[in-house]
């Protein structure tokens, strides 16, 4: 039995990976009158007078919705909301297991940006935060932007920002090994979708100066015209030397390759054309842009992938539970760049100087101390940047 067959049996036996459980026992009339009528009227009156007290009298403070329309699910693509539900259930239990955040899945039977936004806004009073998941680009950018403008609770598209945070944390540690500075790097980001865009913007916020973003047609540059406005935006904030050409052209003399694209598109010759002590994060799944052994044999110093069976897995589970834990604990109104960079530092710092080596730049997912570090770093950054409300 392979992993897929075993997982199918696992899911069939469970009939759902999460459930609603009560935090109180109702064993007599007094319990009933406290938890429900008539006593429940008093917290209702208090919340009506002061809406902020909902954080004291309900579970809003610790509740996150994992919201998807099922248009970009894993490597499966647009499989629709119902078929995406097992993924959203899985995400929800990771929130609970790793950071004690009460998360529940909501899948929406619409692809319309405005319908999704309006639906989420209408259910937001229940929530302390919103995790957007597996929504296709470029719609995901617009949905997140509109929700952030209209809501005063954290809205976080994990496929974008969770991936970007782990990439940055890995790069922080990789740079210690190769003894290079971020501002001196030539970085190639291959893939201009949700993850590639977020990675690029976070690296720029961190201090990178020379990033070239490639899509299937080559480097985004200011000599080209794009129908996708997000490509135009990327071309205006990256590629300072306005290089053009295919990936094989612009990767020459690069220090870092970050792939969120397609399998087997990086050759050994391309790696050899990069600068010495190159760093490659080849994150296409299940087949990376180049396999680690091939990259290493071609001269790469540090290699990461999206797979657990190779060293240095770029795994979002290291980020999103602790990020929401920290944001919820200080009732942050958003998750900003300062909080993301703080999370990346916390993850990177979870690998000690003694442990750090080319095959270990990112901590293991089951090191639960990482989530505590991330939560604390995010809390501190939220307070310092002025988005914490308690």
Predicted regions and their residues:
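N-terminal ligand-binding/catalytic initiation module
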Residues: 1-155, 381, 385-389
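Glycine-rich phosphate/diphosphate-binding loop of Rossmann-like nucleotide-binding domains
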Residues: 74, 81-99, 157, 161, ...
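General beta-strand structural signal in soluble alpha/beta enzymes
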Residues: 105, 131-134, 155-158, 189, ...
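A short, aliphatic-rich alpha-helical micro-motif
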Residues: 124, 182, 250-251, 271-274
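ADP-ribose/adenylate-binding Rossmann-like module
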Residues: 131-134, 256-310
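Short, acidic/small-residue loops that bind anionic groups at enzyme active sites
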Residues: 150-164, 280-285
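Adenosine-phosphate binding glycine-rich loop
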Residues: 158, 282-390
